[in-house]
Every structure is written in C-alpha cells, then in structure tokens.
Amino acid sequence: MPFLLILLPLLSLSSQQTVQLKVLTYNIRLDTPADGENQWPIRKEKVAGLLREQQPDIFGVQEALHNQMQDLEQLLPGYRWYGVGRDDAKTSGEYSALFYRSDKYEVIKSGTFWLSETPGIPGSKSWDAAITRICSWSYFREKASGRSFFVFNTHFDHQGAQARLKSMELIREKIRETAGSSPFVLMGDFNFQPTDAPYALVGDAAQWKVRDSFHAAEVKKTEDVCTFTGFKVEGAECRRIDYIFASEHCRVLSFDIIEQNDGRHFPSDHLPVLAELSF
C-alpha cells in the first residue's frame, strides 16, 4: 500500500506535464537532373545544414525519393524516420516521411493512406488527380513525460482542384478515425492557398477544431507569407501552400518561415515552415 500511495501521485503528475514540440514541414524537391544547378547532389548539404540549425523535434518532408531519404538519414544521425514510397508502399516513388529525434521520442505506431477513393490500396488515385498522393502519420510518445500525440504529413495534388478538396475531406475523416481525441499536428505541402475552397474545411469548427499555426501563433517571427519560391531569392511568385495545422489541444507558441539562402537560391523550391507548440 505505501508503494501505491507514492506511485499514484507520480502517475498523475506525469499525465499533467506539458509537452513542448518544435515541428517543421519541408518540401525538399525531388532529385531530378532537370534542375541543373539546383540538383539534389549539389544542395543536399544545404538542406541538411538548415535542418541541423533549426533542430526541429519532428519534421516532415515531401517529394523525397528513396535515395534522398538515405542521404538525410546519413546527414542527420540524431533522427529516425517513418515513411513509404507512394507508388508501392515500399521504396518506389516520393515519400511524405516523418523524421523525429530518437533521443526524445518513440513511435507507438505508424501508417500511410492514399488520397483516393480507395485509401488502403497502394498506388491508387482518384478524382482529377494527376498523380498518386499519400498521407503518412505516426503516433509518438515523448519519453520524458509519457505524453502521446499524432503527426500527419501529406502532399496534395498540384493539378486537380477536386482532388485537393476531396483529399482534405478524406484527411479530416481519417484523422478523426485515427487520432480520436488525442492532440495532433497536420502538416505538408497542400498545393492550395488560403483563398481556395479546401482551406475553408480546415477551420470548420463544427467538424473539427483545427487552427492554422500562421494565424494562431502567439509570436510570429515573420510577416512573409510565401512558402513556394521556385528556388528564387529574388523575383519569385508568392504562394502560401505549405502549412502546419494544430488541433485545439495545442498552443501555438511561435511561427516562422525559414528563408536561409546563399544569396541566389534557396536550398529547395519551397521554404520550410516552423512552429513551436505546447499541449
């Protein structure tokens, strides 16, 4: 009995501990010779250096091919990752993978679904989507506190307007089904802007209480709204299509768009988005 009297308060204290989480989403641009001076072998060290400097607890990448995943694994030894290639659920095609600090977190379970009418079928696509798209997720436990939470990472179609709308509807359904009442983060390259129809589904409080970290942040470290630049430091088209959305459980402590560059080019054609959360 004395043991129980000591243990129960400790369990109660652990369950009330606050988790502080630094998350980042980054479309790193696939490895293709067509990019010339911006090819992956030339810029991979810059991408890894940016990530080392920002030190996110968890970050999601989009467009990563298997060789790029291997490069990041080698260049960022403090991280482990979960993800699958979208074409075969193995190593073929682009990943929407999640990297996490293995000294701070452990993965309880993970999964991937396809943004289609048959989300359990690898390689499937539907609606007016040009190519196969996925959402990968992990259920994390913070080792220090024992608190757990979900992170979802996705990349929407770049051409199909209906596909983007239907993908947002599907993700809402899947998150409710998978995460239940647990805290969660949804991030990625959504290929829609705040004025587009799918964005309105994010703030539909009657369905799920999710906030855009750009607007919810207590401290906004940038007023820039551009996340796609096509590698260009100057003269880029300005589009905000990369987001970090947080469930109602989360305080958004800060928001930033990382504009690190060499004076001519950014390390990728997208800029990484960073948010600090607590729950």
Where are the regions that the model predicts?
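Bacterial Sec-dependent signal peptides at the C-terminal "C-region" and cleavage site
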Residues: 1-19
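N-terminal, active-site-proximal structural segment of metallo-dependent hydrolase catalytic domains
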Residues: 13-75, 87-94, 169, 279
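Active-site metal-binding loops of divalent metal-dependent hydrolases
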Residues: 28, 63, 154-156, 189-190, ...
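Short, solvent-exposed loop/turn elements at domain surfaces
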Residues: 30-37, 108, 161, 220-224
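Structured beta-strand-rich core segments of catalytic domains in phosphoester-bond hydrolases
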Residues: 58-148, 254-257
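Active-site neighborhood of phospho(di)ester-bond hydrolases with catalytic His/Asp-centered motifs
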Residues: 60-62, 83-84, 185-189, 212-215
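Metal-dependent phosphoester-hydrolase catalytic domains
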Residues: 104, 162, 173-184, 192-279
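Metal-dependent phosphoester/phosphodiester hydrolase catalytic core
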Residues: 130-132, 141-165, 169, 178
